[in-house]
């Protein structure tokens, strides 16, 4: 199980690398999906399945909408791929920064550190996050409505900010 969690962490970092060095929004979507799937799989292996599901829905529901608007508003005639030298340089720079953080942080011996998973704590720790579901839907209703309204308002503000001189992003169909 520890090797699986380390595999998920490495794949998560590769997804973050793909998002950080995205040459165009077309390829950034792929990195975002990989990072969100691996990160949520990591959370499931740690025993927080409801939070993982909520984050997965937020990432794929919210962030992919942002990437769709980015792709539609910034349509490149010749999008750069991950094989271009500039993008490879961004990726290598990101890997260098992460590696220096690992070396300077003293985390080089990460295989000697135990990972607390569902197997380590038993079945009683598998559903600790379900106790927060009642709080989400009882005390948090007002906050969810305010947050949803704020996100909708932010979407329209961004669409108005990026509109052109003659035709905006919000137009009659």
Curated annotation (Swiss-Prot):
GO MF annotation, one: NADH dehydrogenase (ubiquinone) activity
Record-given protein name: NADH-ubiquinone oxidoreductase chain 6
Coiled coil: none
Annotated organism of origin: Gallus gallus
The keyword Magnesium is assigned to this record: no
PANTHER family, sorted: NADH UBIQUINONE OXIDOREDUCTASE SUBUNIT ND6, NADH-UBIQUINONE OXIDOREDUCTASE CHAIN 6
Pfam families the record matches: Oxidored_q3 (PF00499)
Gene assigned in the entry: MT-ND6
Phylogenetic placement of the source organism: Eukaryota, Metazoa, Chordata, Craniata, Vertebrata
BP-aspect Gene Ontology terms: mitochondrial electron transport, NADH to ubiquinone; mitochondrial respiratory chain complex I assembly
Signal peptide positions on this chain: none
Enzyme Commission number, as recorded: 7.1.1.2
Assembly information from the UniProt record: Core subunit of respiratory chain NADH dehydrogenase (Complex I) which is composed of 45 different subunits.
């Amino acid at each position: 199980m520890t090797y699986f969690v380390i595999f998920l962490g490495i794949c998560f970092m590769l997804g973050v690398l793909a998002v950080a060095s995205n040459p165009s929004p077309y390829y950034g979507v792929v990195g975002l999906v990989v990072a969100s799937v691996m990160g949520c799989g990591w959370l499931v292996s740690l025993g927080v399945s409801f939070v993982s599901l909520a984050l997965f829905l937020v990432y794929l529901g919210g962030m992919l909408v942002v990437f769709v608007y980015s792709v539609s508003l910034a349509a490149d005639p010749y999008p750069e791929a991950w094989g271009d030298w500039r993008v490879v340089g961004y990726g290598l720079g990101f890997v260098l920064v992460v590696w220096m953080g690992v070396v300077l942080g003293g985390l080089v011996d990460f295989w000697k550190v135990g990972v607390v998973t569902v197997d380590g704590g038993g079945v009683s720790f598998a559903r600790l996050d379900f106790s927060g579901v009642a709080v989400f839907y009882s005390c948090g209703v007002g906050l969810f409505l305010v947050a949803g309204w704020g996100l909708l308002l932010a979407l329209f503000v961004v669409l108005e900010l990026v509109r052109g001189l003659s035709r905006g992003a919000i137009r009659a169909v």
